[in-house]
Amino acid sequence: MTHLAYGPGGNDDPSVHAAAAKAVELIMDGARVGLGSGRAVRVFIEKLGARRREGLRVTGVTASQASTREAKRAGIPLIELGEGGPLDLTVDGADEVAPNLDLLKGRGGAMVRERIVAAASASQVIIVGEEKLVRALGERGRVPVEVIPFAEWPAMRDLEALGLAPTRRLEPSGSRPLITENGNLIVDCALSEPMVDGRTARELERALLAIVGVVDTGLFLGTADRVIVGHYDGHAENRLTVK
């Protein structure tokens, strides 16, 4: 299977700006907001910081050290998870979005903390550019799996037994394994073919989580309440989950 490169999604991408701007409109005065990680969230944090300077009262909980730095730079006060009760909503990005709004995440390596922050929120809002929409999860990339280092060998064996092609993720320099903020490894698993439907994705998720040493996966299935899709012409649309 050929893995296509992920789309631009950078700070200058008009589709990302459109999605982030629409997400900021959802933030009510006094809200406690979960801040995921990644390039789209970085743009959202910048825009949320601008609204705070205009007088919007808001506090945040971040899912990664990178988002902590961005939030502090934007002037967004940060609180501890659980401080003051549940979060009103979490805004995060995704690497792939299926038609049923199932997600594939984890390219940034912060998926465990992203899931924790989302679970502490009343709703999860995902912001993406239109290039992240796929017909089936796994169409554009591998499935990330976070693994405890001591369990690397048996976990790799069991991942291969599922018909996956696992590869330990390296730091950008390529000289050593990437270590998550939880002290674990990321193993990127190539699929023989995309997951044709939600049932297939859920079967894979169950099989992955049953492997000893696997902490979490990049499959976020049924977690998104709203996906905001930005387009290159500057407009954005809401896609809501029917629950």
Predicted stretch roles:
Residues T2-P14, Q65-K243:
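Conserved phosphate- and dinucleotide-binding cores of soluble alpha/beta proteins
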Residues M1-L89:
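N-terminal glycine-/serine-/threonine-rich phosphate-binding loop
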